[in-house]
Structures are given as C-alpha cells and as structure tokens.
Amino acid sequence: MVAHQKADFKSKWAMVVTVNNLNDKKRADLREFSEWFIETLRLEGAFIGHYFNYEAAPVTIVETLPGNFDSCTNAYQKIHKEHPQVVLVVHILPQSQSNEYEWMKVLASRYGFVRQGLLYDNCANRFQNVETDQNSVFRNMCQWIYRSGTAIVRNEGNACGILHGKDPKPTFDKVLFNSEDIKDSVFKVLHAEEEPRGADQENMLKISGYPGMLNTFGIAQLLTPYRVNGITITGAQSAVVALENKFQVYQAVQDFNGKKLDRNHKLQVSSLVVSSPAVPLEWPSLKKSKKLVEQVGKPIRLSKVSS
C-alpha cells in the first residue's frame, strides 16, 4: 500500500517577466527577488490581519517579449493550462504606463487570477526608490490581493474556461454562473429541496475555517491528496466538497478536522451525513424476567375442540 505524503497547505503562485534586455544576471536577481517579495508580503500582511500562505518560490516563471500581446497572452494561457492550482500571478513590467499593464488586467480577469504588477526598477532596487515607505507599499499590495481574491470567489460573473482545439490560439468559451445557480446548489446540498440521497450525500463533507480569500482551487488544495469532484462555496469561509467516495470523506475528516493552517485559521471538517445513534434496546427488569421464566415453565393446557 502506497502512503501519500500530505503536504501542509501552501497557495501556489506564478511570475510573468517582461523586461527589456533580459539576461542571466537579471534572471538570477529576479529569482532571488521572488522569494524576498513573497516573504515580505507575508510578514506585512500578517501585521494588518491578512494572512497569506504562499509557497516560498513561484511554481513557474514565464518570460514574454516586451510590447508583444501574443507573447503575453501565451504566458497567461500557459500558466492557466499547466498550473491550474495557481492563485496569484505577479507580473514584472518593463516600465510605467506600459501596454503590459493593461494586458495584465485583461488576461488575469480572463483566466481567473489574482494579479499584482511590479515595475522592474522597483524589483531591482527592492523598492528603495519609491516615494512612500516600503511597509506602506507592501500593505497596500496586501489589501489589493486580499480584496481581489475575495472578489473572484464571490463574483457573479466568475467563469470556467474551456479551450477548444490544439491551435496556437484555441477558442476560449466562458460558462457563467450567477448567484441563483449557486443558491440552488446550496439548497440542494444543505437543505431539504431536492436533497441528494444515499451515496451522493455520503461522498460530501463540510469544510470551514480557512482563509476567506481562497477560491475553489485553493479549497481543493487544502484536501490534498484526496480527489475533489466538486465544490460549492456556501459562505465567506465555508464550503461543501464532493470527494470520490465515502471512505475518502471519512479519512479526510480524520486527517484535516482541527488542523491549524496558521495562528488565526483552524479547519473544521465533517461529513455531510450525520450518523444516527443506535436505538437502545430495552431489557426487561429482573422482576419481569422471573415472571416470564415462571410462565414458560408451566405446562400448556390444550382445550378440547369438538369436531
């Protein structure tokens, strides 16, 4: 039997680099900057009550050609396709008021990413030349990232992307879900209206207590390595999750209920189906038992039946 290693919860993020005259020295410095940036973001976020738990390094770094929209689009498509678990994309921009800034906003919205643009010059000097102090800069970014993550989770127009074909520019379709669709799903799962029966309910669990900015991908990561078949967000920090079978639900509850993500977030995980307590058996009293024994010991009288 192979035991799966259950990694602690870490949100994944990616970096897009659009820099003029990019060379190996700049690449090495940006890799070092990425770790410094995410750690500083975590510390400053905790100071104002926003607790980020991103991995220390980006899961991928994608380079694009300056001033090339197709190159920029391909970078976001690549992240979306190859790393669907990515929540945050940090885009290193070549200069202020660049086209890449506008493209970043459009593409991040299209593929459902939280975005944060940074000027390369500020990255190179670690924000030493900005007008405001470094703490304020990072706390403003923390607030933006938190609000953006919450907006993605609650946005009525949040879409699933479907790519058709193998061409360089496949067709991209959006499937929109409005609040009524979500509300119907919640009622079907949690209430008596068309409630799932038997095996369907046994495959579901309730999870709460995680950071409110998480979207469905982030919630699924919490339950690694179990296979998540569906997620319905029921509140700012609660959701109903469908797993593969009832055995995975049982094991996931054992593994994750009460798990601390950080000092302010503790998971609460339970099965959607609450087992009914066994009906207690009513044993006869000693006096009644003796009476029953006496009755059993008496001879049986048969009445004569006339034919």
Swiss-Prot record:
Keyword entries, A-Z = Cell cycle, Cell division, Chromosome partition, Cytoplasm, Nucleus, RNA-mediated gene silencing
Cellular location(s): Cytoplasm; Cytoplasm, Perinuclear region; Nucleus
**Which Gene3D superfamilies does the protein's record reference?**
3.40.50.2300
Single Gene Ontology BP term?
chromosome segregation
Q: What superkingdom heads the lineage?
A: Eukaryota
Q: Which tissues is it found in, per the record?
A: Expressed in the germline (at protein level).
What GO CC terms are in its UniProt record?
cytoplasm; nucleus; perinuclear region of cytoplasm; RNA cap binding complex
Q: What happens when the gene is disrupted?
A: RNAi-mediated knockdown results in chromosome segregation and cell division defects in early embryos. RNAi-mediated knockdown results in defective activity of the PIWI-interacting RNA (piRNA) silencing pathway. RNAi-mediated knockdown disrupts the localization of tofu-6 and erh-2 to the perinuclear region of the germline. Instead erh-2 accumulates in the nucleus. RNAi-mediated knockdown results in decreased expression of tost-1 in the germline and in embryos.
* Entry's transmembrane regions: none
Quaternary structure per UniProt? Component of the pid-1 variant of the PETISCO complex (also called the pid-3, erh-2, tofu-6, and ife-3 small RNA complex) containing at least pid-1, tofu-6, ife-3, pid-3, and erh-2, which is required for the biogenesis of a class of 21 nucleotide PIWI-interacting RNAs (piRNAs) that possess a uracil residue at the 5'-end (also called 21U-RNAs). Within the complex interacts with pid-1; the interaction is direct.
Biological role stated in the UniProt entry = Component of the pid-1 and tost-1 variants of the PETISCO complexes, which have roles in the biogenesis of a class of 21 nucleotide PIWI-interacting RNAs (piRNAs) that possess a uracil residue at the 5'-end (also called 21U-RNAs) and embryogenesis, respectively. Within the pid-1 variant of the PETISCO complex may stabilize 21U-RNA precursor molecules. Promotes the biogenesis of 21U-RNAs. Required for chromosome segregation and cell division in early embryos.
From the Swiss-Prot or TrEMBL record, give the protein name.
Answer: Protein pid-3
Which source organism?
Caenorhabditis elegans
Gene (UniProt): pid-3
